[in-house]
């Protein structure tokens, strides 16, 4: 009996233990499930936090990159301006040599305008008073039909003796130089556009380079002609615009006359002043005309370093040749000039 009782008691204990273990296992499983769920939620929150942090970091990096790009551009602009100033300073070193040659610093300025730019014309002309080297004359060529529209501010400049207004045939941009060539051929002529402010030493540097290269056209800005492997002139759109990798004098540099260009006497072929030929082959593409007529004369072109920055007068860019389809006209007239005169590099 004692053995049977002991056996029954042991059986009850085992059942109780088993029941307790099952209950414990269920409790453990429940706790593990909760921990797993909690860890999953924490993982999701961590991923969301990391994603948000990544976006914020990306935004900060983008802003930093943008700021750096701005800083780099500012530094680049400062270095470019410094390089221009250095080039101009270097040219002044030639002054003692030139002065020793008893130079004649006389020259004339030629400029044209049209009614859309008349309001700013007096500003452009008055600004020339700051030039270190002053011209013998500033000739302003205006189409006969436009004279009546000239504002009083321009007429007052003529009354003061500072400029001389000349009426001429309406040749578009060709008025910049064609009438001046017919007017005199003894002094260098500097051409400028009517919509720009210029560095106050532009005329001085043009004349310095004129004495260093007396037979060359001196231009503050140039385009470089491009040719194919066979030597044919490529379309104007493929030329190297605002070329600054060399100075010349060279056959393949075309002066852009509005930024400040000095034409020595006899630098252009006699046909340059022929209004009929200009109108036929190069109307409103005057720079191409001067270039071809220079090359026909055997004249080379030199780029003036350090003075190629364009500083436009406010409100002058609303109307201009480039806004009126002059891009296409360059292509058309280049083909006409090549057909008429041939490759200018080969002259």
Where are these regions (language model features)?
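Single-pass membrane-anchoring alpha-helices
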Residues: 29-58
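N-proximal low-complexity "stem/linker" segments adjacent to membrane-targeting elements
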Residues: 60-127
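Short, acidic, metal-binding catalytic loop of nucleotide-sugar glycosyltransferases
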Residues: 126-135
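Active-site-proximal specificity loops/subdomain of glycosyltransferases
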Residues: 143-186
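Short beta-strand-to-loop acidic/aromatic patch adjacent to the donor-nucleotide binding site
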Residues: 187-195
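Conserved catalytic core of nucleotide-sugar-dependent glycosyltransferases
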Residues: 199, 204-275
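C-terminal catalytic/acceptor-binding lobe
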Residues: 277-347
């Amino acid at each position: 009996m004692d053995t049977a009782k002991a056996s029954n008691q042991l059986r009850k204990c085992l059942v109780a233990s088993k029941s307790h273990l099952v209950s414990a296992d269920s409790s453990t499983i429940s706790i593990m499930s909760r921990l797993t769920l909690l860890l999953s939620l924490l993982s999701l929150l961590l991923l969301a936090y990391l994603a948000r942090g990544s976006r914020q970091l990306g935004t900060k990096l983008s802003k930093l990159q943008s700021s750096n790009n701005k800083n780099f551009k500012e530094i680049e602009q400062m270095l470019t301006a410094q390089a221009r100033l250095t080039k101009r300073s270097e040219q002044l070193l030639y002054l003692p040599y030139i002065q020793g040659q008893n130079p004649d610093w006389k020259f004339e300025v030629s400029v044209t305008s049209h009614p859309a730019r008349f309001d700013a014309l007096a500003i452009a002309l008055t600004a020339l008073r700051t030039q270190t080297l002053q011209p013998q004359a500033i000739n302003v060529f205006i189409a006969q039909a436009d004279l009546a529209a000239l504002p009083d501010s321009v007429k007052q400049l003529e009354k003061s003796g500072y400029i001389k207004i000349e009426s001429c045939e309406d040749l578009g941009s060709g008025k910049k130089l064609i009438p001046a060539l017919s007017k005199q051929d003894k002094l260098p002529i500097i051409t400028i556009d009517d919509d720009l402010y210029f560095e106050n030493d532009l005329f001085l540097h043009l004349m310095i380079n004129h004495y260093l290269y007396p037979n060359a056209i001196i231009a503050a800005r140039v385009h470089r002609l491009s040719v194919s492997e066979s030597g044919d002139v490529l379309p104007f759109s493929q030329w190297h615009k605002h070329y600054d990798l060399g100075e010349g004098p060279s056959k393949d540099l075309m002066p852009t006359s509005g930024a400040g260009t000095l034409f020595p006497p006899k630098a252009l072929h006699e046909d340059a002043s022929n209004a009929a030929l200009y109108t036929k082959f190069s109307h409103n593409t005057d720079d191409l005309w001067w270039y071809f007529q220079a090359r026909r004369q055997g004249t080379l072109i030199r780029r003036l370093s350090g003075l190629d920055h364009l500083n436009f007068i406010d409100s002058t860019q609303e109307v201009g040749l480039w806004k009126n389809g002059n891009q296409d006209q360059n292509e058309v007239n280049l083909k006409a000039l090549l057909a008429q005169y041939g490759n200018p590099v080969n002259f």
